[in-house]
């Protein structure tokens, strides 16, 4: 559970929101802080990207799909594991989807 703006938001044991509609951009920095991340514009770009990906495909992208999709949209400079791991050192797919209020990617351990 997470207290935010006077309401209780349900999370699973790993901190992922149980209901992605409870997410807001105001909540993202709180979720990021729990991951030890201070959101910068490059972080926001990835967070918004995974939210759009989820809305389009109804699934959270695992790392391979995230890298491939980011490369298609932003080019090789941002669509590579090294860049994404600099932003999300504990796992780009796991941390970005958590901060974006989405379910854990299916293929993430």
Swiss-Prot record:
GO terms, biological process: tRNA wobble position uridine thiolation
UniProt xrefs under SUPFAM superfamilies: DsrC, the gamma subunit of dissimilatory sulfite reductase (SSF69721)
Location within or outside the cell: Cytoplasm
EC number, as in UniProt: 2.8.1.-
Cellular component terms (Gene Ontology): cytoplasm
Active site residues per record: 108 (cysteine persulfide intermediate)
The keyword tRNA processing belongs to this UniProt entry's keyword annotation: yes
Lineage top rank: taxon: Bacteria
GO MF annotation, one: transferase activity
Database matches in InterPro entries: DsrC-like_C, DsrC-like_dom_sf, DsrC-like_N, DsrC/TusE
Transmembrane regions: none
Record keywords, A-Z: Cytoplasm, Transferase, tRNA processing
Primary localisation category: cytoplasm
Enzyme class, broadest EC rank: transferase
Keyword Translocase: no
PANTHER family assigned: SULFURTRANSFERASE TUSE
UniProt-listed NCBIfam families: dsrC_tusE_dsvC, PRK11508.1
Protein family: Belongs to the DsrC/TusE family.
Function, in words: Part of a sulfur-relay system required for 2-thiolation of 5-methylaminomethyl-2-thiouridine (mnm(5)s(2)U) at tRNA wobble positions. Could accept sulfur from TusD.
Assembly description: Interacts with the TusBCD complex. Interacts with MnmA.
Name of the protein in its database record: Sulfurtransferase TusE
Organism: Pectobacterium atrosepticum (strain SCRI 1043 / ATCC BAA-672)
